[in-house]
Amino acid sequence: MPQCVMPSPCPVLVPDVLPAVMPCLPAVPEFVPAAPAVPVLPSRVPADLPAEGREALARALAGPVPGAQRKAAGKLLLPGDDTPLAWDDAELTRLCGFLRSMSDQRDHRGRRIPLDYLTAVAVTAGAAGDDSPDSAAAWAASAPARVLHRLGAPRDGAVQPRRPDAATFSRVLGDPRHAQQADDALCAWTAARARDLRPGMRRHLRIDGKALRGAARGGTAPMLLSGLWDDGTTAAQLPVNTKKTNEIPVFRDLLDKIPEDDLTDAVISADQMHTQRKHAKKIQAAGAYFIFTIGDNQEKLFDAADALPWRAFAGEAWTVDRGHGRIDVRTIKTLPPTGQILKKWPQVRQVFLVERYSYGTGGELLGAVAVLGITSLPPDQASAADLLAYLRGHWSIEMHHYVRDIAFGEDGSRGAAAHQAFAAIRNAVTGAFRLLGAPGIAAQLRASRRDPYRLPLQLLGLAALPPAPA
């Protein structure tokens, strides 16, 4: 058998003396980072935008600052645990006190489910994301007896609480008399909580109407006029009979629903429809201030405001915001009212002009809008920057409508029964979450659904919140 012979390794020749200079490899060009491109301003920039505003616009065109456009993620989601609920008896008593102020319009012989208990169950179920008669009944059917007892449940026999069904929610809360009372009681309760949690603030009341498109019958959608505070709580809400009238006469009734102490020194804003002299007098009589925009419904006022020498003055304040695929630049100017304006509107202390320019992220101009307005706030109490902040706060009421439509699915709900009562419940839940600093209503509702008989009670303040995880 032939033997395998391994070849001998090749000898490695190493010189006795290494050269003093080793041959160099071809030089590699040193890497020099390219200078960031200087963003070019759009061809059409507001003429009175100052240098700082132009720099802010240039930075916005360069791209968003990482994380700058996102809200800070809160820590309020608070997953449930197995520890017993620590009930807050004072807050529970306060809620039940407001709900017991309602007058039950049913015959006393058929009241198996008290109105205050039914509303308390509906609110707690709403905080768990169950904001319709069917889903609230499902929440109540599975709720622990101890929870329903604390909410005021009457007992069947010695132990079992009475559990309302979907028909009871629809029939009782669908009664307009009960729905309005529930709306008023929940608004009063959330206002009391807001005063405790956020005292000493000049409050901003934003008034706007919202159609409940999902509950439309015969081509007409129910309309609700709401007053929303800047902390996210609802001050009052009233239905609008769109077949006979519009929002204008309901405006003053809405203000009558709000306690005088809450209106004193508050700022009230509304859209062009509510720029009415009667509204201005009503607000001034309440000790509050108004901010109104001017439209075609006040032609003489618009012409007088438009005739002011706006081009002779530079903008006093500005903002630049990037988000939703566009960049918005807003500027504002203020001027004192003329005698022509004061003749019909003696409450006015400032007239303002807001211009908004919207750009695409590439710098192309998407649109421009100019808005004229009046306010009873004097310059020493509200600068141009303050007025711009109030106006942006008013326009953000659309975000509240978006939460009700998307997070709660209000527009997708086809149930016409009890629509006002459950809209009031959504308002109360949203306000409670906002007061605690929830990072997002939809995310908080998802967390509540995972722990439906503990976390909603804690978020409504009826039980103590667990310690936040480290």
Predicted regions and their residues:
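A C-terminal functional module that forms or caps the active site or interfaces directly
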Residues: 358-433
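Domain-level cores of phosphate- or acyl-group-handling catalytic modules
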Residues: 248, 252-295, 299
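Generic secondary-structure signature for well-ordered alpha-helical cores
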Residues: 256, 310-313, 396, 430, ...
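An anionic, glycine-rich sequence signature occurring as long contiguous blocks
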Residues: 289-291, 295-392
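Short, conserved catalytic/metal-binding motifs centered on acidic residues
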Residues: 121, 136-137, 165, 169, ...
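Short, structured patches in soluble enzyme cores that scaffold and shape functional sites
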Residues: 209-211, 229, 239-240, 272, ...
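Dynamic "connector" segments at or just before major functional cores
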Residues: 2-206, 229-237, 256, 434-470
